[in-house]
Amino acid sequence: MRAPLLLESRDYLLSEQMPVAVTNRYPQETFVEHTHQFCEIVIVWRGNGLHVLNDHPYRITCGDVFYIQAADHHSYESVHDLVLDNIIYCPERLHLNAQWHKLLPPLGPEQNQGYWRLTTQGMAQARPIIQQLAQESRKTDSWSIQLTEVLLLQLAIVLKRHRYRAEQAHLLPDGEQLDLIMSALQQSLGAYFDMADFCHKNQLVERSLKQLFRQQTGMSISHYLRQIRLCHAKCLLRGSEHRISDIAARCGFEDSNYFSAVFTREAGMTPRDYRQRFIRSPVLPAKNEP
């Protein structure tokens, strides 16, 4: 198996002293699996796509945030009008006496440590900081180098204050419409999602919410739910021994035949063939061995 492409710091950071850079992806195209000599913060502003991080697939859209370590490997697939910012930084070049280890997860080896969502308010606060950071990181004077680190710290604090786990949006004091619906969908991977009931409980207008969701993500609510269910199915196919019919049920598909048809259409292969890709073949002994 070929090693992933390595992205080098010198190709993205203006000098060996500059700690931070911003790469705008307007839009983000399909990008092969790669790793880095630096760390990244990825913030998604619009559109959607499939982000595969350390072999874990995520259907990403507006408000998703990833903290990516240098040794992580990831790729972008099936992108549709995907707009995001990559904030690149080298931890060894940061000199401010800040609690970076608390501000920039992942904090441990657990899966999904690097995946968060950002509130609408947090996105509004982060955007101008990133714009200024992009400007300063293109300069080489000592003051700009120091200012980029200050701006990175400011951004890290804003993200810390306004990030949340997708399944915990209901704990936010003032849940925005998009935050609430994203949380509800994440909790409906294996169960029926009643849109009318959700809107009634949260005092939302269904038609307006559907329009807002499509405007921000580039897809309908039902399509997004189907996509994140398929991502969950891929994880189970790769990392569990559950029967395909059980996986279908765990991912909200009552009919395993329908699940297989949808999966095949989206992935270009059957669930069984997809699973086979991640099963290691046994090493056969040489012919002269007993």
UniProtKB/Swiss-Prot annotation:
Q: Does the keyword Transcription regulation apply?
A: yes
From the UniProt record, report the name of the gene that encodes this protein.
rhaR
Major place of residence = cytoplasm
DNA-binding residues (ranges): 196-217, 244-267
Q: Name one GO molecular function term.
A: DNA-binding transcription factor activity
Q: What is this protein called?
A: HTH-type transcriptional activator RhaR
* Site note Interaction with sigma-70, residues: 246
Q: Which PANTHER family is this protein grouped with?
A: ARAC-FAMILY TRANSCRIPTIONAL REGULATOR, HTH-TYPE TRANSCRIPTIONAL ACTIVATOR RHAR
